C-alpha cells in the first residue's frame, strides 16, 4: 500500500509512504484506486481537517506522532479482492478515497446501487462520505 500524505501543520509538505498490504478480513474488500481528482476543494479538506474530521477518514500509515494525514479525494476504484458475499471481484465503484493505490473497506448496507464502509473508525463521521456507488 502506498499513500500520499500531507503534513497537517503545513499543507505544502507532502511525502509518499509505502508498506506491505494489510490482510483482508472476513466481509472486507480490497479496492484498487484507479483514478481520483485533487482540486481546491480537497485543499479545503486539509485546512478543515481537524475541525470537521477529514483527517479521520483514512489514517496515515507509519505515522506514530499523528502529524501526517491523508487528504480525502473523490475517485474510482475496482474491487480486486472480495471476502464479502455481496460484492464481486471486478466491480467498479465511485466514492471517497485516500490519495493511495489501495483501500480496504467493510461493506455494509449493501444494495444493488451502493454500499457504505462499516470500518469502525468511520462510523462517527458524516455518512455521505462513507457511501460508495456501484457502477
Question: Language-model features: where?
Answer:
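Short, Gly/Pro- and small/polar-rich lid/capping loops
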Residues: 1-8
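Glycine-rich beta-strand-centered segment in the early N-terminal region that forms part
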Residues: 24-36, 50-104, 109
Amino acid at each position: 500500500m502506498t499513500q500520499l500524505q500531507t503534513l497537517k501543520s503545513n499543507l505544502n509538505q507532502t511525502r509518499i509512504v509505502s508498506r506491505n498490504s494489510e490482510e483482508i478480513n472476513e466481509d472486507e474488500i480490497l479496492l484498487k484506486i484507479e483514478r481520483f481528482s485533487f482540486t481546491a476543494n480537497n485543499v479545503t479538506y486539509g485546512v478543515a481537517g481537524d475541525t470537521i474530521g477529514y483527517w479521520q477518514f483514512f489514517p496515515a500509515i507509519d505515522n506514530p506522532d499523528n502529524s501526517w494525514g491523508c487528504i480525502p479525494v473523490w475517485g474510482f476504484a475496482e474491487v480486486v479482492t472480495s471476502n464479502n458475499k455481496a460484492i464481486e471481484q471486478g466491480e467498479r465503484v465511485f466514492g471517497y478515497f485516500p490519495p493511495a493505490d489501495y483501500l480496504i473497506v467493510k461493506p455494509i448496507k449493501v444494495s444493488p446501487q451502493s454500499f457504505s464502509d462499516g470500518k469502525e473508525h468511520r462510523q462517527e463521521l458524516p455518512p455521505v462520505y462513507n457511501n460508495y456507488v456501484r457502477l
